[in-house]
Amino acid sequence: MDTTLSPAVEAEQIADSTIDTVSRLIAGVFSGALTGIFAMAGAFTGAVTGAVAGRAAQYGVLRGAALGAVAGAILSVEVLEASRAYWYLELSGSRGPSSMADFVEQLFRGRLVDEQLMSTMINSHHWQLRISDVSYEEREDVYGELEARGLSGDSLRKLPCYIMSSEMVRRQVTHCTICLQDIKTGEITRSLPKCDHTFHLVCVDKWLIRHGSCPICRQAVKD
């Protein structure tokens, strides 16, 4: 039996394949552009906030703006990526009862000025005030210890995070050992890759910024 496709069918298949490829290319370009816009907007907002905080703390507007720009860009990209995951769950019907406002609030709560930005700035200002009292070698030891203590924003962004689905909740009893609350459907969580311990994203990120190890088993998150 001859299974050779007619020229018309072959042309139709080629056209469909071309349309699919072009559609994916356009979607990729749009996604990249949107991510860039979010990052730029977050960097600008963070830079303004950081500059104001830097002036108030008397350790430099430029340094505060630089720290704020980095933190703002990271936060904006995290919001965009998490929002995509949220809408995917919305379309698949596996989203929990939490609203979009609650969802975004989890990302913003304590992530920009209160934690990452202000904690870094205050520690920096504290050690700058005492810098004249120590030798060069002691300075290197102090700053090396502070740098190694917690994770950077880039390292945090590389750790896996996901939204707790109703199926995951049914499959396992999960609670956050940092805030001592159960992890509910629709909440954003982060799982540490080496030990697989899971926590609320906001809770564990606050911890990792200061410590860089698992709160339960104390295993280092990075090598």
From Swiss-Prot:
Q: Which residues cross the membrane?
A: 25-45, 60-80, 93-113
Q: Which topology term describes how it sits in the membrane?
A: Multi-pass membrane protein
InterPro entries reported for this sequence:
Znf_RING (IPR001841), Znf_RING/FYVE/PHD (IPR013083)
Q: What does the record note about the induction of this protein?
A: Up-regulated by chitin.
- Recorded GO terms, molecular function? zinc ion binding
Q: Where are the zinc fingers (RING-type)?
A: 176-218
CDD domains of this UniProt entry? RING-H2_NIPL1-like
Write out the similarity annotation.
Answer: Belongs to the RING-type zinc finger family. NIP subfamily.
> What function does the entry list?
May be involved in the early steps of the plant defense signaling pathway. Does not display E3 catalytic activity.
**Which PANTHER family does the record cross-reference, listed alphabetically?**
NEP1-INTERACTING PROTEIN-LIKE 2
Question: What is the protein's name according to its record?
Answer: NEP1-interacting protein-like 2
Which species is this record about? Answer: Arabidopsis thaliana
